[in-house]
Amino acid sequence: MKILRKNHPLLKIVNHSFIDLPTPSNISSWWNFGSLLGMCLVIQILTGLFLAMHYTSDTTTAFSSVAHICRDVNYGWLIRYLHANGASMFFICLFIHVGRGIYYGSYVLSETWNIGIILLLTTMATAFVGYVLPWGQMSFWGATVITNLLSAIPYIGNTLVEWIWGGFSVDKATLTRFFAFHFILPFIIAAFALVHLLFLHETGSNNPSGLNSDSDKIPFHPYYTTKDLLGIFLLLLVLMILALFFPDVLGDPDNFTPANPLNTPAHIKPEWYFLFAYAILRSIPNKLGGVLALVLSILILAAFPLLNTSKQHGLIFRPVTQVIYWIFIANLLVLTWIGGQPVEYPFTTIGQIASVTYFATIIILIPVSNTIENNIIKL
């Protein structure tokens, strides 16, 4: 078997990626989230496949087809709730994975980091079109509001919106194409994930100390396969608790009402994992400015490798930047809270302050703290 996995053309790739891969001996549990994301993707593709067998992408039957899945299909309710809550688990793992990358300076592996940003954007697009499919009130109005933002693009905006809608409003054509996108995008995510791994294995993994670990590496199997298995079991435990005991806790009550273009919900908001970006969008009174801020809230991650002037790798020995990092995380939580609140005082003001803080932390505070720490080292 050992000879086969080392020499067989196909098994050799698997062997170099998951078995004999030289891995730093000191990587912590924060490095588990890559494998957990892979597990989440597999769960989402499998549950999504079974849901697609019973779902109909037609405005007249979409809502009732989801009800049919939950009531009449064997374990349909479980598949549906695993898929819905699996998306939340996916984003929790994604945010922790990105947060770990920022904390430990993984952004210096620029190709891997940039592919990761593309993966994040693709996953957000997939989740958005997926949220429209049940065709509840929040699905319909969420699709209307978010797609309508594209009309802020000069010259081509209105044409682009109508092209995406497939008509003059969100309707049957929109739902059908969103279903097509939602079906194909996870496979594109899987392809990007392989490219992400390819670039990562070219350079080797980062580690908590931020030091070169070439002299101290161990094989991935059995040490990190067992470690990842523990993480996977814990993820499945949390997912099953969510799906079985609190299936609707992360959903929106408005989505239990079929879509009605004549009745607007009191407060239109996306799923919880988009609320931070939604709060940034709403904090700018200008439509085009809001759209640009929304896009930049994700794309600004690409600035981390460019703004990195620190002589040290990661934040493990950098107390000043550590404080700024945790302010950044707390600020993100504030933005998430604000995104779910109505557009009124004092929430609008808090949102504007938090939005400015979000960008200022990355563009100003972290580079300044890098310079301060570099000067402290010289003393």
UniProtKB/Swiss-Prot annotation:
Where does the UniProt entry say this protein principally localizes?
A: mitochondrion
How many cofactors are bound and how? Binds 2 heme b groups non-covalently.
Q: How does it sit in the membrane?
A: Multi-pass membrane protein
Q: Identify one Pfam family in the record.
A: Cytochrom_B_C
Which residues are listed for a ubiquinone binding in this entry?
Answer: 201
Q: What else is known?
A: Heme 1 (or BL or b562) is low-potential and absorbs at about 562 nm, and heme 2 (or BH or b566) is high-potential and absorbs at about 566 nm.
How this chain assembles, per its entry, is: The cytochrome bc1 complex contains 11 subunits: 3 respiratory subunits (MT-CYB, CYC1 and UQCRFS1), 2 core proteins (UQCRC1 and UQCRC2) and 6 low-molecular weight proteins (UQCRH/QCR6, UQCRB/QCR7, UQCRQ/QCR8, UQCR10/QCR9, UQCR11/QCR10 and a cleavage product of UQCRFS1). This cytochrome bc1 complex then forms a dimer.
User: What is the protein name for this chain?
Assistant: Cytochrome b
